[in-house]
Amino acid sequence: MLFSTKAEYGVRLMVELGRQPGSRPVSLNAIADAERLPLSYLEHLVAKLRQAGLVTSTRGAHGGYRLAHPAEEITMIEVVEALEGPIAPMECFHETPEGKVLCSHADEVDRTCATKLLWTRVQGGVNRALAGTTLAELVEFSRPAEERQPAVGSAA
């Protein structure tokens, strides 16, 4: 499964916002410069993140964007789905509002899709990894090794 640059750049944008001390607003120009990303593309991404309630904006000379919630409360599945839409390992997959995964190939023949089990497991693994990773973890991981906080339960 490949994610597009929307997910990659959007996660990098969110990490940059998470690095800011005191949750002060950050301009998209500053993020574009820090991450070497195209400003026009970031404008498109931040609109999706704002619509999803993950970032807020402040107008004015010292305005910009900031996280709408603490980094510890933002999971990567929220970020990726805000940018990419529902996560599906194959184009033939779609999820019902009840969360049931359906395969369009199952309609073509009078039997269950032969590979649905495999792709459902792939989707579940990806979703668990994204849901189990917070923005705070990525912010901490992005720091130089000597500045990182020890992980909970690790030897100091």
Task: Please name every model-derived segment.
Residues L28-R36:
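A short alpha-helical element within helix-turn-helix/winged-helix DNA-binding domains
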Residues L54-H62, R66-A68:
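Beta-hairpin "wing" of winged helix-turn-helix
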Residues L13-Q20, A82:
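Short amphipathic alpha-helical elements of helix-turn-helix/winged-helix folds
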Residues P70-A156:
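Non-DNA-binding regulatory cores of transcription-related proteins
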Residues M1-M14:
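Short alpha-helical segments that sit at the start of domains
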